[in-house]
């Protein structure tokens, strides 16, 4: 039975396939580039036009900025559907990740050029590149583990820490460089990170074996699965996956205020002045640097949250992926109450009582958002790889990221309402909506779990 989860030729490091760490570092650098660019995107668009100044931006209003941000991030993830489909039908995940990495290197390099045409052209390359890379590298992580290997969830937690290590370093370093030297130096630095990731991937291909190969190849043992119709169990699992995407849309619609409304709130309405001076940045913390807080908490808490759920499951308590995702939405909702408190410091009974709110409320909000994210996001990635039929593995992962993209668009639309509704009303409304939604998912959990037909109940006998 041991061969169910571990094959003799599989090389391991710290209890996981070596290939996991290859993908860990590739995704770390890809996320360094993406989140580094994202940390300064809305700030760049909203910055005033100052000819000849490296800090000159587009001079857009908050509403215009948040609308564009939502649309851009939506398309970044919507392209995961064709990216996953092309991988499933024509080239396989391994080549799709390679192609995506090349396009991302080109896109980020173009962004370093200080010209309007370069900005929009670079974003187009990034949108297409992420569409090829993002769903397929996640599917490859799942492909490292055989059916029934309960290391899969923990493997995705490790992978997720890599994502957020890159996000932390990207937001911190790119944000600081952009604040000191100019926006396009920040964009260029993000491109260097992506180039490093591409080099790591090319070197690490030998550790991935056949994982990510196109199953339609003549010598593929799974070739016949492309023609085999879905059975009832597979159809039910597809249905519950699509239903779970609604959770994803709600979660990211709230969470992605971090790159939109919360980013602008940090820049315009948060007291970022320290009583002491820090090397390189002085005594005022750049607004973009605050986006590294979430990633920092994930690096610190990722293993602990994963271990908590593992122990929780061993005690025989409810630990399905859908339950964890619902709990994640509720925990994230509590984070927005701290943003409500921040907004209330500025506005009390309709009157302005303070010019800016304290930084501590942002930190506490990001803490709860992080715990919620750790309960929902890596679990959702693993959930898709457990339930998706092999012939649609990358397509369904692409659909997951498309749901993330829709959530990003929703985030931009919600954030844009703050110009009329007010920050306090938006933050409080998000908190209430997410709490009610999470409780509703828990209430209908049993029928949803039946549709999975025990996909998460298969346990490995021995992982040693």
What residues fall within each predicted segment?
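Intracellular loop-helix junctions on the cytosolic face of multi-pass helical membrane proteins
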Residues: 1-22, 147-148, 175-282, 304-305, ...
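Cytoplasmic membrane-interface "Motif A"-like loop-to-helix N-cap segments
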Residues: 89-101, 311-330
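Conserved MFS/SLC helix-loop-helix module at the cytosolic interface between two early adjacent transmembrane helices
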Residues: 79-113
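Short amphipathic helix-loop junctions that connect adjacent transmembrane helices
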Residues: 39-64, 258-287
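Hydrophobic core of transmembrane alpha-helices in multi-pass small-molecule transporters
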Residues: 107, 118-133, 348-375
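C-terminal ends and interior cores of transmembrane alpha-helices
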Residues: 99-120, 326-351
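Glycine-rich segments within core transmembrane alpha-helices of 12-TM secondary carriers
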Residues: 76, 151-179, 186-197, 201, ...
């Amino acid at each position: 039975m041991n061969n169910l989860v571990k094959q003799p030729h599989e090389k391991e490091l710290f209890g996981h396939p070596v290939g996991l760490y290859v993908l860990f570092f590739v995704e770390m650098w890809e996320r360094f580039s993406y989140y580094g660019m994202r940390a300064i995107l809305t700030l760049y668009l909203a910055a005033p036009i100052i000819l000849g100044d490296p800090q000159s931006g587009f001079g857009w209003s908050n509403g215009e900025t948040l609308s564009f941000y939502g649309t851009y991030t939506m398309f970044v993830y919507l392209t995961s559907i064709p990216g996953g489909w092309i991988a499933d039908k024509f080239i396989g995940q391994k080549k799709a990740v390679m192609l995506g990495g090349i396009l991302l290197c080109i896109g980020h390099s173009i962004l370093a050029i200080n010209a309007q045409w370069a900005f929009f052209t670079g974003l187009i390359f990034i949108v297409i590149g992420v569409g090829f890379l993002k769903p397929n590298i996640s599917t490859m992580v799942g492909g490292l583990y055989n059916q029934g290997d309960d290391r899969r969830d923990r493997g995705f937690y490790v992978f997720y820490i890599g994502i957020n290590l890159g996000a932390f370093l990207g937001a911190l370093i790119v944000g600081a460089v952009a604040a000191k030297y100019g926006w396009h130096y920040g964009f260029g630095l993000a491109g260097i990170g992506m180039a490093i990731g591409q080099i790591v991937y090319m070197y690490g291909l030998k550790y991935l074996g056949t994982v990510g190969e196109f199953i339609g190849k003549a010598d593929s043992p799974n070739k016949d699965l492309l023609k085999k119709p879905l059975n009832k169990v597979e159809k039910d699992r597809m249905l519950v996956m699509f239903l779970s995407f609604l959770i994803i849309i709600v979660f990211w619609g709230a969470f992605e205020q971090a790159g939109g409304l919360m980013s602008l709130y940090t820049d315009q309405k948060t007291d970022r002045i320290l009583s002491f001076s820090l090397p390189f940045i002085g005594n005022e913390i750049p607004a973009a640097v605050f986006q590294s807080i979430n990633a920092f908490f994930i690096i610190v808490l990722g293993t602990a949250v994963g271990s908590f759920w593992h122990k929780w499951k061993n005690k025989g308590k409810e630990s399905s992926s859908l339950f964890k995702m619902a709990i994640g939405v509720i925990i994230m909702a509590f984070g927005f109450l701290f943003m409500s408190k921040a907004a209330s410091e500025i506005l009390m009974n309709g009157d302005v009582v303070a010019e800016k709110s304290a930084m501590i409320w942002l930190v506490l909000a990001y803490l709860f958002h992080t715990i919620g994210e750790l309960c929902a996001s890596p679990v959702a990635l693993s959930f898709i790889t457990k339930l998706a039929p092999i012939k649609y593995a990358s397509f369904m992962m692409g659909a997951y990221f498309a749901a993330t993209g829709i959530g990003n668009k929703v985030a931009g639309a919600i954030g844009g309402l703050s110009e009329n509704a007010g920050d306090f009303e938006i933050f409080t409304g998000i908190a209430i909506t997410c709490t009610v939604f999470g409780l509703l998912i828990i209430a209908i959990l049993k029928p949803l779990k039946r549709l999975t037909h025990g996909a998460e109940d298969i346990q490995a006998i021995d992982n040693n």
